[in-house]
Amino acid sequence: MIEENDVIKTNKRINNEIAEGTEGVVLCVFDKGKEFLIEFIDEKGETIGNGMETVQQADIDLLIKVEK
């Protein structure tokens, strides 16, 4: 289960700025884990685009589980 602060990777292109394979951090979980607010970052650690994007669970994969 993907939760806040976990690191994810997209498994498809989200928009013109967020390509397949882009990494991000989960900021918020919506609708019992069906949607997520993600801060996406580039290879330099810089925020991509407007800083946040809402994505569907099917469009992301868990990369790093952050222990609480």
Q: What annotation goes with each model-predicted range?
A:
Residues 63-68:
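Long, low-complexity intrinsically disordered regions
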Residues 3-62:
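Basic/aromatic-rich interaction segments and small domains that mediate binding to polyanionic partners
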